[in-house]
Swiss-Prot record:
Sorted UniProt keywords: Disulfide bond, Glycoprotein, Lectin, Membrane, Repeat, Signal-anchor, Transmembrane, Transmembrane helix
Subcellular location: Membrane
Protein name: C-type lectin domain-containing protein 38
An MF annotation (GO) of this entry: carbohydrate binding
Membrane topology, Extracellular segments: 62-382
Gene behind the chain: clec-38
Keyword Transmembrane: yes
InterPro entries named in the record: C-type_lectin-like, C-type_lectin-like/link_sf, C-type_lectin_CS, CTDL_fold, Snaclec
Ranges in the topological domain labelled Cytoplasmic: 1-40
Region (Disordered): 97-116
Domain of life, source organism: Eukaryota
Amino acid sequence: MAIFYDDPLERLNQPIKTKSYRKKQVVQRVHVFIFDNWKLILLGILNLIFLIIAIVFAILFFVGSADCAQLPDYTTSPASQLTTSAISSRTSEVQTNAITTTQGTPSNKTSTTTPSTSKVICASGFTLVGTKCGKLVSSNQPRTEADSICKGYGGSTLFSVRNEQETRDMLDFVKDSNIDFLWTGLVCNQTARTSCIWDVKSGTTADYNNFADGFPNVVYGYCIYFIVTGNSAGQWGSEQCSQLMNFVCELPTTIRDPDCKYNYNKNCYIRFDITLTIPQAQRFCNEKGADLVSIHSANENRFILTIYDIHGQILLGGLAPAVDFIVWLDGSPTTYSNLLYFYDTRSCVLMTVARGGPYDGDWYTMNCNVQEFFLCKRAIDF
């Protein structure tokens, strides 16, 4: 609404909205905005700081590794029982990539070998079951022992069922085996169906379950079995983990590579029992067309443990500027972490290998000048 002044002097006495006044209003609005949104602004600043730290850390790390341009003469470990795994060394090896890819009954000793033109394979002794590889073990074992036996087969786990198709695939796989029940890789510590967890924390039953009526039931037990025969075939029940049952071990498919001893999930792992620092080991692996190993699942972590028969540590190709922040040297994203021991002043990541003992598979940070055995990893070309 317009304001009229009877006296011209009164008009002159009114405050004039100068540029400084408008600037003051802008400052006030900015102040109010910051006050109302300070949490979001602080979160953004922290994320930016973490990003800058990671970039600076990576730059300093590789600049510091320049002193390693001339690598020392590599000496093998004094542990005489260890065998140096060079890429070209394949004599007297078990060929883990001799496989079968046709679905067949596990009770039948014969199997159809894939033609040489097929590259998608299963490890030796495993059969293609849908999109995964399975090995039926016709030996009644308590659940813990069954899991241990599976681990001995290339780090495999007790089988999982994540959808209806996988249920049908498993029933077809064991239909002629004369088996009624199988241990699965599922454990339920509560009665709620969504509370169950697959082995090595590889998922839950939140998206799919096929429990029979009244299950899971912790009164019967925490371990889950798969029903093979009868009207309830394909459904799941609960049982004491000490109960004896047959079981199926599971591995992912991979790609044929006759030059690879340790072949898992379309990657080749090359073990070197020589002691280097992480910068030196990364350069060494690069010269072999690979990278220092990165790990992206609990299943992969489990597989790597089967490569080693020692008590000690191996280098991983990771840097940890923060407990929940790992940068892999091969540039792959961080989708999994088993970093249990983090030290602020130590940023290079190592893994304990202890042949099933305490801390087996645990990760921890250490000074980057420490020298240990290491594992290279390269993708297998399809």
